[in-house]
Amino acid sequence: MLKKYFNDPVAFALVLEHSRMVADKALAIAASANARVDFTFIEEAALLHDIGVARIYSPRLGCFGNAPYICHGVLGREILEGEGLPDHAMVCERHIGVGLTADDIIRQKLPLPAREMIPLTLEEKIICFADLFYSKKPGNIPAEKSLNEIRSGLEKFGAHKVVVLDRWLTEWGMS
């Protein structure tokens, strides 16, 4: 389904490679977390979590849509709801950073609907967490970020974002 929405083969290849790495990481986290999760859903949703990138404007990614990058989660939700995948759609919307609160959106003046976009289910949280490890930057996709790099990136948006990360690490026995 991912290919259906990408006109540029370079953009498709970048997003597919990134999404495959996120899916593999999410499946490994789910397996080690000893929790009851839907592994099939995790793989499917992780592979589709960045489908909204097809509609953003980012020439370095080979995308020439109209929306800014931050909108790719909401756009992905729209796409997947249209495809009849409402649960997968919520992963798209809720995977940005460790999630966006309505307050984050308002305070940062983001071009997004002012609503809660934080991962709620364990599967959503695992995919969101796994996504933090990988960039979509061409030439840098396979490089896995360290937890210190992830923490530094999240700190730019407030200490409360690092608290969420640390809570997940503790919950999953990874701290």
What are these regions (language model features)?
Residues 7, 35-147:
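Divalent metal-dependent catalytic cores for phosphoryl transfer on phosphate-bearing substrates
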Residues 19-24, 45, 49:
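Short amphipathic alpha-helical segments
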Residues 2-3, 23, 27, 76-81, ...:
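Amphipathic alpha-helical segments within well-ordered protein domains
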